[in-house]
């Protein structure tokens, strides 16, 4: 029945807000930040309503996806994490991921993330090539993407994944290989 505990150990939090829509994205998102606070309040209410669905399972993963979760600020994270820890048991070694756009990951923002239990960042780089980034309607450039990865590492977030899109119009295999080499050079 619906009231029986479900044996799950992960929590996905969809953050449907973006500063700008990307050409390729089919996920629900909104550029109207005026809806952010009501959405977060509804999200917290949803956690309260569903807290019993997990039973005694501790959350092993918490994933903030989107949209663009890096559009959230300190107040937003504070409210959401308070609700998570109030309503759910979180495993001590839980993987807690933030999807982020490279241009949001400035020093002040990455430093702020240390106040929360994030231990993984999934960076929406998509490409290191200016033509591809323009085509995809992305806000960042190659240098911002590289700097964002470096800042995460500097602030102790070393579990970083990078999304890259292949097969775009006019994209060459040579460009794909170059992106892969650049991505690989940041693994240490």
Name each model feature, range by range:
Residues 2-6, 182-186:
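Short, small-residue-biased leader/transition segments that mark boundaries at the very start
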Residues 9-10, 58-60:
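Structural signature of beta-strand start/N-cap positions in the alpha/beta core
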Residues 25, 50, 187-188:
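Generic hydrophobic alpha-helical segments
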Residues 20, 130-131, 187-188:
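Glycine-centered loop/turn positions within well-structured domains
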Residues 7-15:
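Immediate flanking context of iron-sulfur cluster ligation sites
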Residues 14-27:
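Local cysteine-cluster metal-coordination motifs and their immediate loop/turn environment
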Residues 29-53, 59-183:
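Conserved non-cysteine loop/helix-boundary elements of the Radical SAM core domain that shape
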Residues 3, 15, 77:
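ATP/adenylate-binding site constellation spanning eukaryotic-like Ser/Thr protein kinases
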